[in-house]
Amino acid sequence: MSGGAPATSVASVSTRAAWLAGYDANARRAADWVHASWHGALAPLVATMQDHAPALRAACSLLLLRTLGAPSPSLDGFDAPADRLAALPVADTLRLLRVRALLFRRTELRHWIDRASRMRLAGWVGADGCRALAALSALPDAPRARDLEHREPPVPLAQRSGDDLAWEGWRLFERERAWSPAGPMRIVRLALPRDAARAPWIERAAADADGATLLARLPSLFPEWSWLFG
């Protein structure tokens, strides 16, 4: 009997296990990345964790997530490509959220040509994120660009922080229903300020395909993340 079919099944399980392992690694480091606004009564404990052994930091992290009601995803909880972003290191997922926000602001971003602005941009999304933005912004989108000229966000990009942009990217992806509301990406919400307000210009903006385009092109834009799409 040929072993072809079982091999395919094993590969699928192995890939899903890798996604779950990435999520678990994030969970065990939650004390390092959960935004301070979520710490609540555990804030004194979290504040002391940097000086403790990894096992104790992991225990604190899991306690923090349980207190906050973070999900425990199953192997099939990563079926949607966007849900698999929860398996990336949280810092990388936040960079990607900023890329999504900056795509929305691509018209404004075209004026960011001085050295200081480019360095700030690289700090937000990294060198690979800058390359991804350049590639995506070069796609044929003249009608979108003209449309954006008439609905620039009221808060200028220069006044935004990294957290602000990650939150804008989160809201844009959520508006597009990119991931399951009860899925693994809920954990990433904890990396953003608890009381972040919904940006009215995002809520009122016309629908676009930027998020879907970004997700579809992730394997070519970020080859090191190809394991997410195995």
Language-model segments: residues:
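General marker for long, soluble alpha-helical cores
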Residues: 1-230
